[in-house]
């Protein structure tokens, strides 16, 4: 398998960046390390598979097989191997790789030999979860993650490869080993035939991956801080509205229980009364806290506005006795 992995292409890596839902196309081409298939090629394979499946189901035996065939054919003319968005089934990927004499084997298959399985001895893996496909491929003796959601292939060390595959399996990913005679070289003239591919040196791939990681890290941190700030901005009115909504919900549940009668009626009435009392207490305490804050603010304002008698006397710069003497002198002058 080591010789099969030695694709030359001048030491370049072939990578395709995600376009729509064509991850299956990208997965097949990065497995082959070249733009060998387009979405139209895989669509043709899907149509052929659909026709064969319908033929097999329509020729099924009587009984359960006929019922299953009826259910299968009743789904209309829609394809069972490609969605309207361009997501292809594993059968389509298998057919595409069979063109190049490659086999797609599930890792949980006895053919893989799970007890003695060593991922470093393989050449390529296909990974699938929900609607996404991507390829892990050995090129020139080094492993790369050719996920089309990445701007460039991500290098994987041999130690990390096993841990990465185990993590994928533990997360529910379906993983398939690809075995056979891989194409050793793809003519560079075919580059851009599907409009998605690019040839990169390992250094270029490493540089692109590093730069993207540096750009994403501050953005992710900003996003986390923004969420935290938004969560702290919940006003008291929002809290009161949430409490009112909870009280209304409890009252509605209690009313439905009372309508049923029986032993639930008394319990429902008690729950309804308790929820209403709880909300009233919370609302009252909220209003009291508001009134207390307003009174405290008013007291602070009154203390600030009241003049200090000592300050007034010192500001006038006069003594009360002196003021009294001056008034008596003025009265005596008037009498004379």
From Swiss-Prot:
It catalyses: Thiol-dependent hydrolysis of ester, thioester, amide, peptide and isopeptide bonds formed by the C-terminal Gly of ubiquitin (a 76-residue protein attached to proteins as an intracellular targeting signal). The active site is at 23 (nucleophile), 132 (proton acceptor), 147. Coiled coil: none annotated. Keywords: Hydrolase, Nucleus, Protease, Thiol protease, Transcription, Transcription regulation, Ubl conjugation pathway. It is an enzyme of class 3 (hydrolase). Its EC number is 3.4.19.12. It is found in: Nucleus. Pfam families: Josephin. One of its GO terms (molecular function) is cysteine-type deubiquitinase activity. Residues 244-263 form the UIM domain. One of its GO terms (biological process) is proteasome-mediated ubiquitin-dependent protein catabolic process. Residues 10-193 form the Josephin domain. Residues 299-327 have a biased composition (Polar residues). Residues 281-336 are annotated as: Disordered. GO terms for cellular component: nucleus. Interacts with key regulators of transcription and represses transcription. Acts as a histone-binding protein that regulates transcription. Acts as a deubiquitinating enzyme. This is Putative ataxin-3 homolog.
